[in-house]
């Protein structure tokens, strides 16, 4: 059976296209007393970008902090903030949820849009296709490129027991606004780590057992764009990286990621690392599985003067190490894409432990 997967319904791309947001949202406002919820990374407080938000009188602006990886408890807190606002007299769901920021902010926006129409805690839905009700209309506006969160069907969350996404067709954004100008102020190291998330998406997709002509076409183009951005640093690198993120996300939508992402989930869960740097730390020790990709990755690191932290796992207790292994091992589709249906014979607990202990 071939997958019949959902994609983002509408996309606008171009420098300055953020200015069209008011027109885009106007068509979704159902009544004069309706409202939208804006989730915006708090690094933009008192910024020029905040002043450009097309807020209406009853709209709700929630500043989100993404110093840590998005957690299910935080999603539940934000969802309750919206529900409390509704109960203050509006008595209706918002007409839309808009996420403005990097991958973590976009994941939070996706999760809140889902949880406003589904009961319980977001932790109840960590897994594959557990969501029953469609999300609120939701929009992504990336201010950092690489994660592919703007096109993916997952919202990656750290819960009480595991780091695992809410994977559902209902998670996919209805609209994305891709304005390269919004990414121009990103710190260089953060831009690199997030860009490498995209590069690693491509490596894992293009070398995986789930590879097909669809995922290959998107993956190869995204890989070429990553090379232009991180090895050649030609003109319009912000626009190219934004499109690499989009294409890389589309590539894994019809295939899957692999070993690096599985190990990174374990690292992030126990050490509370951000996804991008967690991927970089793990990928640097995966020459055995991705020799060409790791070689090129190291070339990119050298060109951009990136030094990764070392020895993160060396003094770790056995309980934490076992928890990392547990988190990584539940990601069956990632391992199968990387190593095939018999992956458990190759990637044993001892093998994963050996890889982690190098980090």
Locate each region found by the language model.
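ATP/NTP phosphate-donor binding region
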Residues: 1-96
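C-terminal charged capping/lid subdomain of soluble metabolic enzymes
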Residues: 6, 298-359
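Short glycine/serine/threonine-rich phosphate/pyrophosphate-binding segments
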Residues: 18-21, 45-48, 104-110, 148-151, ...
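Glycine/threonine-rich beta-strand-loop-alpha-helix active-site module
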Residues: 73-80, 85-181
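Glycine-rich phosphate/pyrophosphate-binding beta-alpha loops
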Residues: 146, 250-274, 279
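Carboxylate- and glycine-rich phosphate/diphosphate-binding segment that chelates Mg2+/Mn2+
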Residues: 154-254
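Active-site pocket-lining segment
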Residues: 265-318, 322
């Amino acid at each position: 059976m071939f997958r019949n997967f959902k994609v983002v319904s509408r996309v606008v791309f171009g420098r300055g296209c953020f200015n069209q947001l008011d027109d885009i949202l106007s068509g979704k406002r159902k009544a004069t007393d309706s409202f939208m919820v804006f989730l915006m990374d708090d690094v933009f407080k008192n910024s020029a970008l905040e002043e450009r938000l097309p807020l209406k009188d009853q709209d709700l602006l929630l500043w989100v902090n993404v110093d840590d990886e998005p957690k299910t408890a935080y999603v539940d807190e934000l969802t309750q903030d919206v529900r409390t606002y509704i109960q203050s007299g509006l008595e209706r769901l918002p007409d839309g949820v808009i996420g403005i920021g990097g991958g973590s902010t976009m994941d939070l926006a996706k999760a809140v849009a889902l949880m406003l129409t589904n009961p319980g805690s977001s932790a109840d839905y960590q897994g594959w296709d557990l969501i029953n009700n469609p999300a609120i209309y939701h929009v992504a506006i990336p201010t950092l490129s690489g994660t592919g969160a703007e096109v993916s069907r997952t919202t990656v969350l750290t819960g009480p027991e595991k780091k695992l996404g809410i994977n559902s067709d209902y998670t996919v954004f209805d609209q994305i606004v891709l304005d390269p100008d919004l990414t121009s102020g990103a710190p260089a190291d953060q831009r690199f780590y997030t860009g490498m998330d995209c590069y690693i998406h491509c490596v894992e997709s293009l070398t995986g057992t789930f590879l097909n002509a669809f995922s290959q076409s998107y993956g190869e183009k995204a890989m070429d764009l990553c090379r232009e951005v991180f090895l050649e640093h030609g003109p319009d690198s912000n626009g190219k990286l934004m499109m690499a993120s989009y294409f890389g996300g589309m590539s894994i939508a019809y295939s899957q990621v692999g070993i690096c992402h599985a190990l990174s989930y374990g690292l992030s869960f126990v050490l509370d690392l951000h996804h991008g740097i967690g991927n970089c730390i793990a990928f640097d020790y995966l020459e055995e599985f991705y020799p060409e990709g790791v070689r090129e990755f190291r070339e990119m690191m050298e060109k951009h003067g990136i030094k990764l932290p070392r020895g993160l796992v060396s003094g770790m207790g056995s309980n934490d190490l076992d928890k990392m292994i547990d988190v990584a091992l539940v990601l069956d589709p990632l391992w199968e894409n990387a190593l095939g249906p018999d992956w458990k014979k190759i990637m044993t607990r001892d093998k994963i432990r050996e890889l982690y202990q190098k980090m």
